[in-house]
Amino acid sequence: MKKKIALLAGLGLVQSVVLAQTKPTDSVTTLKDVVITSTKNNQKQSQTGKVATILGPEVLDKSYGKTLPQLLAEQAGITVTGATSNYAANKSVFFRGAGSAYAIILVDGIVQNDPSGNGGAFDLRLLPIDQIERIEILRGGQSTIYGSDAIGGVINIITKKGAKQPLNVYGVASAGSYETYKGTIGLQGTVSNFDYNISYTHVKSDGISEAANPVGNSTAFDKDGLKTDGVNAKFGFKFSDNFSINPFVRYNTGTYNYDDGPFADAANFSILKNIAVGTNAVYLLGNGKVTLNYSHQKTSNDVNSAYPALLEGQVNFLDVYYNQQLGKKLDLLLGVDHRDMKLPSAAGSPKTNIFAGYGSLFLHDLSVFNLEVGGRYNKHEQYGENWTYTITPSINLVKQVKLFGNISTGFKIPTLTMLFGTFGANLNLKPEKSENYEAGVEFNFADGKYTLRGAAYKRNLTDAIIYNYPQGYENQVSQKTKGFEIEPAVKLGIFSLNGFYSYTEGDEYNFVDNGVADYLFRRPKHTYGATAGLQATKDLFVSVNYRYVGGRTDGDFNSYPAAVVNLPSYKLLNAYAEYSLAKSRVKLFVDTQNILDEKYNEIYGYNSLGFNVNAGVRFNIH
C-alpha cells in the first residue's frame, strides 16, 4: 500500500517538474468543458482525474423505448443483471465487478437508499426515463464524497425541471411487445421566479414468465406482469439572485408478479410503494456557495407468496456543504452529512445512524497539472469511527492528451436487514473496507471529433459480506477485482460512433463453491459494444446498437448442495428510429430490441426477453 502511495506521489513530482519546465455524440457526451456536478465542486471534464460518463438530453431523448436499467447496461464498466429479463424482475447493478450494494444512486444529488432492500440498494424500476434530464456516471471509489456504499461507483440521475415557457404540456404514449403500454402526462413551466414540473406515469405489461420452463415440462408457465403508477413533482423558488429553494415529491406504487425461483412457476406478487419528499437549497456568497440537500424516503414491500412478509425501510438524509474559490486555481469543499435508517416492520423497529464530515482541495489549471485531495471522517452508532481518503491527479501533457490516476479508500456498513432482518441476520458483522487504484489516458483530437479513453483499475475489498446459505450473512476474507476499459468515439457531422470494451476479473468467496473462487459470480469477464447514430435528414434520426456479453458462472440452486453452472455468452442487436413533426413538438419513435431473437439466460433458470418492439409518440405543446 505504501509503495503504491509513493508511486502516486512520484507522479505528482513528475507533474511538478513538468510545471517548472468530451466531445458531443449521439450516445455519450464527453466534452472537455462539460461540468460534472456529482463531484460537488463542479469540475470540468478536462480538469478531473475521475472516469466520468455523461448521458445528456441527446441520449435520453432517444431512449424513450428503453428502461433505465437497459440504458445503463449499455455503458462501459456496468453490468445490470435483469436488464433484459422480464420487466417485473429485480435489477442489480454491477460496477466494475462490484455488486449493487456497492453502488450509490443519487437523484438530483441526493443519496437514494432502501434499508429493507437487498444490500440497501435503490430500486431502479421506480424511475421512468422520460423524467430524466441527464445522468452522470462516476466509476471507481467515491466514498470520500458520498460515504458508505460508494465503493464501485456513483450514478447521479438529474431529473427535469420547469420549461422556459409559462406553460408546457408534454407527454409520452407507447405500446409494445408483451402487451406493454406506457403513458406519461406532465406540466412544466416558469412564471417569474417560480418554476415547476409535475407529471404522472402509468406502465402496464403482461410480460413473460420470469422462470424458465425446464426441458421436458409440458405445462405452460403463466406470465409475470407488472402495473405501476408514479407521480413526480419538482419546484423551484428563486427568492433572490443569491438564494433558491427546490422542493420535490416523488411517489411510486407498483404490483410486480414473480415466480418461486429458477424453473419454478408460482402466482407470487409484491406490492411496492415508495415515497420521497425533500428539498434542495442554494445560497451564493461571493465566490462561495452553500448547498443543502434533505430527503425523507420510505419504502414498503408487501410480499405475497408462500412466505408472506411486509418489508419496510425508512431513511432521513441531510447533507450540507460549502464551496469556496480560493483564487482562480484552488477550490475548497467542506461538508457534513447525517443519515438515519430504520426498519419499522422488523421486530423492535431497529434503527441506526451515521454522521460524517468531509472535505477536499482541488488544484486546477496550474499549467498542465490538476490535483484533488480529499478526506472523510465517519462516525457510526454501532461501529465507531473511521477515515477514508482520495488522491486524484491528472496531467494534460498536450491539449490532446491527458493522463489521470486515483487512489482512494472506501467502506460499507452492514445494512439493517443484515443485522436485524428476517433471514440470516448477524449482529457480529464487521464493516467492509476497500482500497481502490486507477490509472488511465485520454486522447482528444480534431476538437473532439475523435476521442479515446483507456483506464485500468484494481480494487481490494476486505471483510466483504456475503449471504452464506444456510448460515446467513457473514464476513468473508477478501474480494479482489481488477480490469480495464477502452472507450473510442467518433463524431463526424451527422454521423456518430461510440464503442467500449470492458474486461473484469477477480476472486471472491461464494457458497456455491463453498470457498474462494477465481471468478466473479454472474459477472462476465468480457463485454463490448458499439452504437452508431445517423441524422439522416433534418427530421429523421436512426441508430443501431450492438452489445456482446461474455460467459458467466452461476449456480443451480435446485440441487443441494448448489452446483456450478456455466452460462454461455450472448449478443444483442438493437435499433432505434425517430421522426420529428410540427417543428419537433411531436416525435414518433420505434425501438427494437434483440433483433436477432437471441436465446439466452442472464440468470440460470430465468427467462430473458426475445425480439421485442416498442413504438410511440412524445409531444411538447407550448
Please give the residue ranges for each predicted region.
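Conserved C-terminal beta-signal and adjacent last beta-strands/turns
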Residues: I5-G10, V14, A20, Q188, ...
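N-terminal periplasmic "start-of-domain" segments of outer-membrane beta-barrel proteins
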Residues: D33-D61, S92
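N-terminal periplasmic accessory domains that precede
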Residues: L68-L71, K91-F94, A103-L106, F122-R125, ...
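Extracytoplasmic beta-strand/coil segments of soluble accessory domains associated
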Residues: P69, A73-V111
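Short acidic/polar hinge/loop motifs at secondary-structure boundaries
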Residues: V111-R139
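Periplasmic-side early beta-strands and strand-to-turn transitions of outer-membrane beta-barrels
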Residues: N156, K164-P166, V172, G189-S270
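Outer-membrane beta-barrel signature, preferentially recognizing the C-terminal barrel domain
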Residues: F263-N280, L284, N396, Q400-K402, ...
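Gram-negative outer-membrane beta-barrel transporters
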Residues: D365-S367, K458-N460, N475-F557, L596, ...
